[in-house]
Amino acid sequence: SNYSNFKVFAANRKISGFRIRLFFDNKQDSRVRSEELVNDFTEQYPETPAYRTHTSPFFKVTVGDFRNMSDAMRFLKTIERSYPSAFIVRENINPPR
């Protein structure tokens, strides 16, 4: 179908960049906590994409699609009061629209 072709195309368009890791844990309540975190973050920052991933046994929440470190730093400064343990990670990102 056209839809699955589009999904493959979209996945291949990822580029190298930076995101901000808000959460990384493998405790019993990590699934629930990571879901709540995504919901809270998305309410506060609706313009910034939030990605929740599970790489057994860890749940991770990572946010943003930043092409360069300075953009990531700027956003980290914006959120550091709400998310004091947040840090920048280098990841493949979705190109900003």
Where are these regions (language model features)?
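Acidic/polar low-complexity segments and flexible, solvent-exposed patches
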Residues: 1-97
